[in-house]
């Protein structure tokens, strides 16, 4: 089997799903700083996407935006081909878009289960399938899935979310096997990184300080991990966990003094 990934990945065209805000925005900024042409995917937040596009262009980079509802499998399946009309063939796919809602055995609904699995698992699979199919014959490619350190522990209060992210972890490994040697497939699992929608500032502070290292990660650290993956030609099928050690010292829900 002939090796294709022999050195650091040269900048080309990248798409980041959910790229207009939070961790996705940091990844877009990092990739642009490394010389990549970036496509900022968004679902409903067009203003943030446009503002980020203008920021990248102002700094001398190339950026475009594209809208798609990843809860719709048809939209997910068509996103790569539509994106390639912007700057040409993609060589980097970052599956960052995610749905994160809490549900339990009692509160879980079919709708909750479906949207988590559609966005967090099915969309990355369909995007990866299209990406692999359209990747130029002699070009190496990379797929990076943004997962969660929660894959190390079952969470009864986040059934749909935890299940979908665990599926994405195994999908990372299976795709790394199936798409080698041409495409490397990797994952990053952040812990406490940014305040969640249900959290108060105090909740997030307590969560971050509860981990073994006393602090979680930052969006910039996740972006640095992206750069590490791009530069590590032998790295595939693995998860980089950036959580201050939270996966080593899980706190039961009933013992927590904060909301996730």
For each feature predicted by the language model, list its residue ranges.
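Catalytic loop of short-chain dehydrogenase/reductase
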Residues: 142-180, 192, 246
């Amino acid at each position: 089997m002939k090796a294709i990934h022999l050195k650091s990945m040269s900048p080309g065209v990248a798409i980041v799903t959910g790229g207009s805000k939070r961790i996705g925005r940091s990844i877009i900024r990092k990739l642009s700083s490394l010389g990549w042409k970036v496509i900022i995917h968004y679902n409903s937040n067009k203003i943030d996407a446009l503002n980020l596009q203008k920021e990248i262009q102002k700094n001398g980079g190339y950026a475009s935006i594209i809208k798609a509802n990843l809860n719709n499998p048809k939209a997910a399946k068509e996103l790569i081909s539509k994106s390639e009309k912007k700057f040409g063939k993609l060589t980097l796919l970052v599956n960052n878009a995610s749905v994160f809602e809490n549900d339990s055995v009692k509160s879980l609904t079919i709708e909750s289960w479906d949207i988590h699995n559609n966005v967090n698992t099915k969309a990355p699979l369909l995007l990866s399938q299209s990406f692999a199919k359209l990747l130029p014959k002699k070009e190496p490619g990379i797929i990076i899935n943004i997962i969660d350190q929660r894959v190390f522990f079952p969470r009864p209060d986040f059934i749909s979310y935890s299940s979908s992210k665990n599926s994405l972890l195994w999908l990372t490994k299976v795709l790394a096997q199936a798409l080698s040697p041409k495409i490397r497939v990797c994952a990053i699992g952040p812990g406490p990184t940014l305040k969640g929608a249900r959290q108060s500032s105090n909740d997030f502070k307590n969560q971050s300080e509860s981990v073994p290292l006393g602090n979680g990660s930052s969006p910039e650290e996740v972006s640095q991990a992206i750069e590490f993956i791009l530069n590590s030609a032998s790295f595939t099928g693995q998860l980089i966990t950036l959580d201050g050690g939270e996966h080593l010292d899980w706190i039961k829900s009933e013992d927590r003094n904060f909301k996730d």
